[in-house]
A protein has these predicted regions:
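N-terminal catalytic or cofactor-binding beta/alpha core of small enzyme domains
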Residues: 2-135
Length: 135
C-alpha cells in the first residue's frame, strides 16, 4: 500500500475509537460497541462492489448512541469508529481469508475457522446478507 494511501486511512480513522468516560467510574464494568462504527474509509468504498447502504447491513447501527449515556451512571463505553464490514474487532488478529490476499498468508494465520470459511473473518468478504464486498 502506498504511503499516501496509508496516511489518508490514518487521517480518516484517527482516533479509531471513542471513549465515553464517566467523571468517576462507579460501575464494575465497561461497555463496548465494536460494530456500530460509521466512518467508511474512501479506499474501502472504492474497493467495494456495494454501495454504502448495502455495506451498512453488517453494522450494529447506532448501538453506540443508545448506550453512550452509560457514562452518566458510572460506566465507560468504548465505541469503534470504523464499521465491522471494514474490520471486525471480535475476531482473532490473524483470522484471515486467503481469498482476499494476493500473496500467501503466514502459517500462523487462522484461515480455516468457521467464520473465515463463511466470509466473516477479521476482514470480511461478505456483508450480513451474504453479498460479496469486494470487486
Amino acid at each position: 500500500m502506498p504511503h499516501r494511501e496509508r496516511a489518508s486511512i490514518k487521517k480518516e480513522l484517527t482516533p479509531p475509537f471513542r471513549v465515553h468516560a464517566p467523571c468517576e467510574q462507579t460501575a464494575p464494568f465497561v461497555l463496548c460497541s465494536p460494530h456500530s462504527g460509521r466512518v467508511y474509509p474512501e479506499h474501502f468504498l472504492a474497493q467495494s462492489r456495494l454501495d454504502p447502504l448495502a455495506l451498512r447491513k453488517s453494522e450494529d447501527g447506532y448501538v453506540d448512541e443508545l448506550f453512550r449515556h452509560v457514562a452518566e451512571f458510572g460506566a465507560p463505553l468504548i465505541a469503534a469508529r470504523f464499521p465491522r464490514a471494514y474490520l471486525d474487532l471480535n475476531r482473532e488478529a490473524y483470522e484471515l481469508d486467503p481469498e482476499l490476499f494476493d500473496t500467501p498468508l503466514p502459517d500462523y494465520a487462522n484461515t480455516q475457522s468457521v467464520r473465515v470459511v463463511g466470509g466473516l473473518g477479521t476482514i470480511a468478504r461478505i456483508v450480513a446478507d451474504g453479498e460479496e464486498i469486494y470487486r
